[in-house]
Amino acid sequence: MPERLQVYKCEVCGNIVEVLNGGIGELVCCNQDMKLMSENTVDAAKEKHVPVIEKIDGGYKVKVGAVAHPMEEKHYIQWIELLADDKCYTQFLKPGQAPEAVFLIEAAKVVAREYCNIHGHWKAEN
């Protein structure tokens, strides 16, 4: 059963869906159940995927990886998301852009999530 803020992917066409309101049904695309994307938190590949959260004046800066993640046509971060105080903030990225986002919000505790088009869904908490 899908739950709020879970991320699902279609293994056939690549559609990605974030659940806004969980229900009792299954998520289906291209006549197949969509796959729940697990949130990875440990990166064995030299820490290029785990979000790094930095408190800045007036908000938070999220960088993808302790070592900057590639942002090439075939391998890049599609989006960075910040969850805070029951709100969700998303910055969509394109190849060539820096793998980072600034969110000008005040919150004591935040969760950063990002999605790599090849290596999937990653998460970190402050």
From Swiss-Prot:
InterPro entries: Desulfoferrodoxin_Fe-bd_dom, Desulfoferrodoxin_Fe-bd_dom_sf, Desulfoferrodoxin_N, Desulfoferrodoxin_N_sf, Desulfoferrodoxin_rbo, Desulfoferrodoxin_SOR
Enzyme Commission designation: 1.15.1.2
Residues annotated for Fe cation 1 binding in this entry: 10, 13, 29-30
Biological process annotations from GO: removal of superoxide radicals
Top-rank lineage group of the source organism: Bacteria
GO terms assigned for molecular function: iron ion binding; superoxide reductase activity
Protein name per its UniProtKB record: Desulfoferrodoxin
Keyword Transport among record annotations: yes
Co-factor note (free text): Binds 1 Fe(3+) ion per subunit. The iron ion 1 is coordinated via 4 cysteine residues. Binds 1 Fe(2+) ion per subunit. The iron ion 2 is coordinated via four histidines and one cysteine residue.
Class in the EC hierarchy, top level: oxidoreductase
One Pfam family here: Desulfoferrodox
Subunit structure of this chain's protein: Homodimer.
Family statement drawn from the similarity comment of this UniProt entry: Belongs to the desulfoferrodoxin family.
Residues engaged in binding Fe cation 2: 49, 69, 75, 116, 119
Free-text comment on this protein's domains from its UniProt entry: Is organized in two protein domains. The N-terminal domain has a fold similar to that of desulforedoxin and contains a mononuclear Fe(3+) ion, center I. The second domain contains a different mononuclear iron center, center II, with a Fe(2+) ion.
Protein function: Catalyzes the one-electron reduction of superoxide anion radical to hydrogen peroxide at a nonheme ferrous iron center. Plays a fundamental role in case of oxidative stress via its superoxide detoxification activity.
Iron keyword on record: yes
Catalytic activity line of the entry: reduced [rubredoxin] + superoxide + 2 H(+) = oxidized [rubredoxin] + H2O2
Residue ranges of coiled coil: none
Note: Catalysis occurs at center II. Fe(2+) ion of center II is the electron donor and is converted to the Fe(3+) form during the reaction.
